Amino acid sequence: MHKIIKLNLLTLCICAANQSYALQALNDQILSDVTGQDGISITHEASKVDIKQLNWVDPAEVGKTPIKLGLHNIEVKTATGYNNIKTKLDFDVGTTQLANGTQGVGIQLSASVSPFTATAAQIMLMCSPNCATGETDQNLGSFKLSTISPFEVYLATTNGLFNRDSKVHLDFKLQNASISYGQNNQDLTLKDFNFNLSADGYLYIDETEGVVLTSKGSVGDNIVVLGRVEDKTDVHDSRVGNATNPGLNVDLRYGSANSTHRNLIRIGASGALTNGKIALNADQTGVAKFNTVNRVNGNVQENEVVASAGYGFKNAGGLHLNVSADFTRAGNSLLGAGTPTTFELGHTGTGSYAIEFSNLSPLNVRTSTDPNSAINSQNAYIDFGQIYINNIRTNSMGFVVNDQIKTILGAQNYELIYNPSPTGNASNMAFIAVRGLDFQAIARKARFISDNSIAVNNTNEGTWGLGIPIYNLNANAAFFAKKYTNTAGTVKDGLGYDIAVSTDGYGEDSQGNPKTTSIIVIDGAMSKHGEEVNYYTGLRNIDSYFKANGVIGFNENEIYIKADSLLFAANAEIAIGQLPGSLYNCPAGVNTCAKEVVPINNFAKKDDVLASIAFMLDGKGELFIIPGLEAAGGTPQSNYLSFKSNFEFNTLSSTDLSNESKKGSFISLSNTDSNGTTTKTSSFNLNKMQGHLGLNGKIQMQKDAVVMDNQVQFNHKALAGGQGTAFRAEVALSPTGTMQKVADIAITGGAMRSTLGITPR
């Protein structure tokens, strides 16, 4: 025993002596120079990483077994042209200085990952080992993430790590990535995905909001920049070195891993944002709360209603997220040399075109009825509301709608109770809820742009614009595994869904500024008063409710969406006029006239309304989304988005057919007249709609126009070679509020074709 100890000591001494060349004496002066200013740097390299399971365990409902959502059989490999996956982390604590000159004592953290490809063979929703009767673990599909540019994150603080009163700087660079969701050897892919963000702001922990990252603090706001990113794929020779994609780029493609992906749609955003905020916590108590907005005699009434059914999981925990930001436009005091916010929307792939939207503004042009008051300088904005993510197990859930939708549906209560489960029993599902999403932005300028695969499209910025603001959107979405049968009769795996969505048509904030859900086109030509005239036309103040459940399947060359049940109800105003706060234009032939402001609450009035439209469609349907072809030399004539769909109305019983108060599926055009004391509403109606309709179409984004070709089939099955059902409806008038039947109509077959081309000036 003693000999062994002596031998070990001898061995230690020999090893120490052998390595003594690496050691040197340090005096006090040298020690005083060691400040740790270089921090800690960690570099890790791997040729491959395998992970069997990566699971998120949701506590679900109190007293019940948890549900897991995870990525299984993960494989991370190097990207083509790289030997290893290189991960580097630099961490330093001490004196810091941000790019804007702010100094302090905090941390600097820099992390990067070289290009890689990560694949998860299964996205699993698991109840095991405690599955209830009839429940099984569910495979929801596959996931893949790959990059061709390094993924980089940089964070610098000026006072510790979390401090609501001291600035931080964040760079987040996920550039030229590819993110795919797969089913049946087909992938829905975000190609050239960018989330390229640079921001100054504040990072802190709040007792209510949780972890908060915001650009706005007690001493003012800062800029968040979505910087454009160099396009490294499919760039035209004339644009090499200058081709860029938006800082937030969502480019949807579809196809198998071994084929050229086809083209769906592209959405992008770039430029400077303000009042940006991200908050993350586990508080789920708000998931059962619905804010609804009712309109009574032109007055707005906002109410909070707590749903009673299906939200027992709110006391157990989950993920709660809030994201919001304001858009900037020319003249914003924080912009400096920065670029205002722009949106891009259009087709994608070789030879494609899109529309760039700019001058993002609120609905109201002014905030005062004084004709000499300044133009509204408030920002347009997006607030994604309160987002809740959970794994749930239920077969009953409540969803609250406003008074307008309750009337259209003929519902007894504001809370609509439904079963989101694919069976009659409670099932485990992945669940996402949104409460109070607002997108209040009008794009008053627009121009056509070209894809980087072709030469630059040098069209001038037009005087037209588009507004698709959304007010108080609430949504429930549940997802689960579900089988379906394709057109060839083959049973395939699909993603089951159950979705409920609602919007409110009109509301006002605490200062009386209007909010709306609308789809309007803007004419921003100059008026006789020397400012934009702001004519608009379209559907405004849209109250809507959409409820569907079914399955999403990935077929070869097409995306298949089946709705086993589909209910869509809405009420809107068909209107033409000028935006609130604009100056009324002078009459034709008159060059000068007195300045008068369009009322700020103009959207709450009926002055611009041509008619109101309301409808309810209740039945089932199918939608086939067919992506555009991707090929060298592609053009809008070969690369376009098309679709085929059909909808079958629910059959009414003989009792309901003979009951005039039962409208079934209907469309109504109405007009309201008022003499100041009494109001009368008359309407023209198509009630009790039945049959099987088909709708096919294609959308072509051209160099300077949008062209839509459509075909409506009045007896879908008959035209498809089967035994069909004629389209039938009841024509009725309601001149005094009482429904009066005029006639029955039936269309036994045939198709109606139309082509709509929109060429802005």
Task: Give, region by region, the residue ranges found by the protein language model.
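Gram-negative bacterial Sec-dependent N-terminal signal peptides
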Residues: M1-A25
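N-terminal low-complexity, acidic/Ser/Thr/Gly/Pro-rich segments
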Residues: A25-L26, D33-R761
